[in-house]
Amino acid sequence: MNDVLYAYYQECRQTMPVDATLVFLESHNGMELAGNLFAIARELTTQPAYQHLRICVCCLQDHLRSLQALCAHYGMQRITFVIRESREYLEVLATAGTLFTDVAFHPLFLKRSGQRCIATWHGTPLKTLGFDYMADEYVVGNQKRGFTLADLLIMPNVYTWERIEHSYQLEGMVHARIVYGGSPRNSVFFDEERRNALRHSLGVADKRVITYLPTWRGKVIDVDARAQSEQLQDLLEEIDDRLDDDMVLWAKLHRLNHQQLQLGHLRHIVAFPQGLDTYDVLNAADVLVSDYSSVLFDFACTRRKIVLFCYDYRQYVRQRGCYFDPAQLPFPLCTDVDSLVDALRSPDGWEDAAFVQRFVAHDSLHACRNLCAHIFGGPKLHEVRQPVDPTRRVLCFVGELNKGKETDALFHYLRETFGADRCFITYMNHLFKTHYERLWQFPFACQVPMYMYQGYYAHFLPQERIALEKIRRSIAEGKEVDAAAEETLAEQGRREYRRYLYENTYDRFVRCGGLDIESLKWFAVFPKEKWLILQENMLEKAGRHPEYAYFLKRAMDRADRIGYANEALARRSVRLLGSFTCQQQILSLYPDETEGM
């Protein structure tokens, strides 16, 4: 998003009223309209009770025609599509009274008074999520932010929320109410009439229909699509030779895997039917074959056969990790084609009352309808409120966490000083894209990664860029900085602080490191207690870069307490930046190696 569009979004927020009748849905960042949000959109656009609502759906430009055709097929003509990051999209983002997401809200979204955010999730997790799978730490920040912005969370079961709350380190950070009302997308599994009609229209009424939906491999930012597709191609060709003539297998790769399977020459295996809702098609199937995907929990609503085809079972569980061993599920687990074919030919059916109660007890034909009624003025469902955490909250900005004495000392300082408090560490997520293991050094702290969008540390309005350039000129010329320009930039800092830090409240901000200017700006405008810990590399940069020195001194002027890593550093600071009136102390984080300089 460029400066012009960003300024337009802020203008819309400031000048356009929130419209309580405008509903906005963004599914998988505009890549599709699927799962829970498809089910909700269908309910809102086809039921007379919601005719007063205007329904807008986000999509990417390349997906517009396919999504329009999908919605037309299901009679969802009242939907208005807005292209992600277009002016129309920004208007809706700024003014919609109700906003839905199944992954995260736009990274630059700032919730207004009168807007309510509703977050669902795309499945009951078997494979690890969030900080439990640190290879995806780079993208976790905005997903975590989505949960903290939410006013209402739609969860299929208690297990799913427990896993999400723990894996995204959300304890005490979420203020939303939770509804355990089943998954809206699963309501279709209870529609036997629709199942029979679709089987007839697809020409498989007399076939044994098998669906194959494997999950993806790799990281969200680096899906190993080619290797997985090549492996699946070989496996499917082998499976095709072994299937019975009354069997047809519909194969569908995960949306994150953009590779295409070559199925035209196979006899029994074809591509998953296009132009239809995935769950509508799943309801027509007799058997689901999957692996570690959440779809297996959803399909369990049907009580039909489920087979786990985990050809990389030991490797996947070891490298990616699962919340429990897939072998504990009440379904056959197959690691090769022979065992898979045997499982497909075995008698249907399974029974496990404990599994059903734990994962799909809330699902029903009317789950989606009941949920929409709950949200938009109809009969209410039971809501669970999150407990309030009274513990003092300390936010620590930790910089890059390079291996060495500074990081080792910081670890001990934070643990000893704030051990009785709730400690949150925050950092720029891009710094740990390839070095996420550095974050393992702080197991006692809750992580609050700042999600840098499109490579920008900060986003500015035109007048704020002008103010920044004015300040830079004054610094370069050795002149006093204009107070009005400084206040304009302070307002930018307040807005970015809200956006980056999920609009959560903290009792103390401890800036422990980092060579960026943006966090110094946020520190200076933080409304509560501020501690700044000065380290060697910060003072070294201040000596080389007058602009950094200005913002560092500005932050220290506003600090309630300044801690120096050692006495020599304190003396050098006075020579370079001057004296400060707040409480100051020598922390003795590491020896005075600069003594005598």
Listing of model-derived features with the role each one plays in the protein:
Residues 152-176, 519-520, 538, 558-584:
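A short, active-site helix/loop in glycosyltransferases that binds the activated sugar's phosphate group
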Residues 33-41, 46, 183-261, 334-336, ...:
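Conserved catalytic-core segment of nucleotide-activated headgroup transferases in glycan assembly
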